[in-house]
From Swiss-Prot:
Residues 74-191 form the PX domain. Interacts with SELPLG. Interaction with SELPLG is controversial. It comes from Homo sapiens (Human). The lineage of its organism: Eukaryota, Metazoa, Chordata, Craniata, Vertebrata. This is Sorting nexin-20. The modification Phosphoserine is found at residue 3.
């Protein structure tokens, strides 16, 4: 079984590897090395095929084809398109709009997010704790004593922050780090899972569908990282009486788990898919057999439901 889980910590597979080379000295990827995006640093230790996998020959071929494809590096471009000043009762700050697109092909799922200067500063502080040597040549745009809200200064800092993100992304260990992923996705995911817990399914779904494409691009080397969010999409659709859309989201999640029967989401997801398949008149027997085989090999004291598991994510 997977090692003990920490609530609020969606797991990702593989060891944490430290980067010892700069961008121009990057070595090819040899295994998943993304720390999972939760706050507690837990890693799912079950990567790769289960030794007791019951996959058919065709499924095995598809699995290894996916393994080859997963190492194709997805290249992203960061653009800070605009900035605006926002004033509140006791504070005044600049909000930057970040657009993230995939290069090399038409990207109809570009991500648009907003971050404050203080968010960038927190990212820099977090990265210095783990990657001080790796980012020593990356200049972070500092605040000035005066003039921070002048139009010329905002434009200058906008360009500098855009360059900053590009330089960070060029460093392999940084772009795969929990800190970088959290900066780009965690605020939206935390709000989405909060809405899920509150039963606000339309709003949760809106946020999830906005952030999921970016999360999947950032974790292309670690497909299971997006499983919690995909399961949240399944739950939203299911509770909004959209079983077909829920089933489609579940299929995407299962594809990312492949034969990883030890993953904490594997059995709860299969159980939910069996019920959806039955309701939709689809083949639920095959899914039921996979679930039963998994439970025989990895018996658990009490089956946790997919919803019980998913609502524990992003609590903090």
């Amino acid at each position: 079984m997977a090692s003990p889980e920490h609530p609020g910590s969606p797991g990702c597979m593989g060891p944490i590897t430290q980067c010892t080379a700069r961008t121009q000295q990057e070595a090819p990827a040899t295994g998943p090395d993304l720390p999972h995006p939760g706050p507690d640093g837990h890693l799912d230790t079950h990567s790769g095929l289960s030794s007791n996998s019951s996959m058919t020959t065709r499924e095995l071929q598809q699995y290894w084809q996916n393994q080859k494809c997963r190492w194709k590096h997805v290249k992203l471009l960061f653009e800070i398109a605009s900035a605006r000043i926002e004033e509140r009762k006791v504070s005044k700050f600049v909000v930057y709009q970040i657009i993230v697109i995939q290069t090399g092909s038409f990207d109809n799922n570009k991500a648009v997010l907003e971050r404050r200067y203080s968010d960038f500063a927190k990212l820099q502080k977090a990265l210095l704790k783990t990657f001080r040597e790796e980012i020593e040549d990356v200049e972070f745009p500092r605040k000035h004593l005066t003039g921070n809200f002048a139009e010329e200064m905002i434009c200058e800092r906008r360009r500098a922050l855009q360059e900053y993100l590009g330089l960070l992304y060029a460093i392999r260990c940084v772009r795969r780090s929990r800190e970088f992923l959290d900066f780009l996705t965690r605020p939206e995911l935390r709000e989405a899972f909060g809405c899920l817990r509150a039963g606000q399914y339309p709003r949760a779904l809106e946020l999830l569908l906005r952030v999921l494409p970016l999360q999947e691009k950032l974790t292309a080397h670690c497909p299971a990282a997006a499983v919690p969010a995909l399961c949240a999409v399944l739950l939203c659709h299911r509770d909004l009486d959209r079983p077909a859309e829920a089933f489609a989201a579940g299929e995407r999640a299962l594809q990312r788990l492949q034969a990883r029967e030890g993953h904490r989401y594997y059995a709860p997801l299969l159980d939910a898919m069996v019920r959806l398949a039955y309701a939709l008149g689809k083949d639920f027997v095959t899914l039921q057999e996979r679930l039963e085989e998994s439970q025989l090999r990895r018996p658990t004291p009490r089956g946790i439901t997919l919803k019980e598991l998913t609502v524990r994510e992003y609590l903090h």
